[in-house]
Regions:
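Short, acidic/polar
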Residues: 43-61, 136-146, 232-243, 317-321
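Substrate-binding cleft and catalytic face of glycoside hydrolase catalytic domains
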Residues: 59-199, 203-222, 228
């Protein structure tokens, strides 16, 4: 073989090799923006730091983010229809137009679902376990097909939101939907259908049904289990062990990480240690369960009257991003801030001012090196 022929073969080989290489994904920096359409309906506006008005999703991209997270409720008609599938589509279309990836968060409730409450949708109440699995399947497929028919493909899909105690179980609630507390400050479970402690097999069965429903519409989307308290190794051992032992599977683990709430709830006494423990837990659960991890919710205290506290919050977010990238052996794929755009008077762990401008906390998304 002459040199000319050899060089041609070498060139073709190199071209084919380069074509076969999978493009490395970026580290995902995201925000949960579920409130934005509701804020807009209230007349609230968003601005760059220098006062230029900008739509919130576009502003997030300007601030260095490349992904969004949006929740969906089953029948939120009693709650203004926010986070219905129609409202969800509006928000997802904005993200798609900006080439931002989408994380879809199924709450499987008519309103908020979290560790304290996972109330069964009103239209599913009283159904048997098998009927409720069909309800879950139908709702999941309906929402996903609605998105698909409108050109939206979520990169990630959560089956449940912060399912520390399982999902599709109900507590006694007041007329506004909030749990009623007894004299000892505890909630009263009125229906334990998918509770992890009381009906572990059914919790796993619901999750497995949700997983398969997601894959039936979007087989390439990454389906996620999401728990709170990312620093709590024992929680993840127990809950994910229940799912695995009862035949459920997932593609990725999602974590919530809130150092402020960890202290406020008495789980820890040092905010920085909460972050340290979460990073260690990311590596632990990834190795034990054989999958990647993302921090799908985080947030840090906003107090503009205290510049030192604001800088500390910025530094904590920067550290969370930095260590997720550099200190998890590549298994942590992203960090999402929960509702950074919200007003501090409404929620104190956002990252914007009362008049809709990003605070110094948001600087961490572009400069997380220190």
């Amino acid at each position: 073989m002459n040199m000319k022929s050899y060089l041609k073969i070498l060139l073709v080989t190199l071209i084919l090799a380069s074509c076969g290489q999978k493009e490395q994904e970026p580290f995902w920096l995201g925000a949960d923006l579920g409130w934005i359409t509701q804020y807009e309906a209230w007349g609230h506006k968003f601005y760059t730091k220098d006062g230029q008005e900008m739509e919130c999703t576009a502003l997030m991209k300007e601030l260095g983010l490349n992904a969004v997270r949006h929740r969906v409720w089953v029948d939120p008609s009693k709650y203004g229809n926010w986070c219905s599938k129609e409202d969800l589509l509006v928000k997802c279309q904005r993200a798609k137009a900006l080439d931002m990836e989408i994380l879809l968060d199924f709450h499987y409730s008519d309103w908020w679902a979290d560790p304290a409450k996972q109330n069964i949708p009103a239209s599913w109440s009283g159904h048997s376990y098998e009927q409720m699995k069909q309800d879950l399947w139908n709702h999941t497929v309906e929402v996903l097909n609605y998105l698909k028919d409108n050109g939206i493909t979520p990169k990630w899909i959560q089956v449940g939101n912060e399912t520390r105690n399982g999902f599709l179980w109900s507590v006694k609630s007041n007329k506004f939907g909030w749990p009623e507390l007894d004299e000892n400050g505890n909630t009263t479970i009125t229906e334990s259908m998918g509770h992890v402690d009381r009906n572990p097999e059914q919790y796993a069965g619901f999750f497995a049904t949700g997983y398969e429903a997601c894959k039936s519409v979007f087989p390439k989307s990454i389906v996620m289990v999401h728990l709170d308290n990312g620093f709590d190794k024992d929680l993840y051992d127990y809950n994910l062990g229940v799912l695995k032992d009862n035949g459920a599977k997932w593609d990725m683990i999602g974590m919530s990480l809130y150092p402020f709430w960890a202290l406020d709830g008495g789980f820890r006494t040092d905010e920085d240690q909460v972050i340290t423990d979460c990073i260690e837990n990311i590596k632990y659960v990834s190795k034990k369960f054989g999958c990647d991890v993302m921090i799908v919710e985080t947030g840090f205290l906003v107090d503009e009257s205290d510049p030192a506290r604001m800088e500390r919050s910025r530094s904590q977010l920067a550290r969370t991003i930095r260590e997720s990238i550099n200190n998890t052996n590549g298994v942590c794929k992203g960090v999402f801030y929960w509702e950074p755009e919200c007003r501090p008077s409404q929620y104190k762990l956002g990252a914007f001012t009362e008049d809709g401008r990003p605070t110094v906390i948001m600087d961490a998304f572009k400069d997380w090196s220190e």
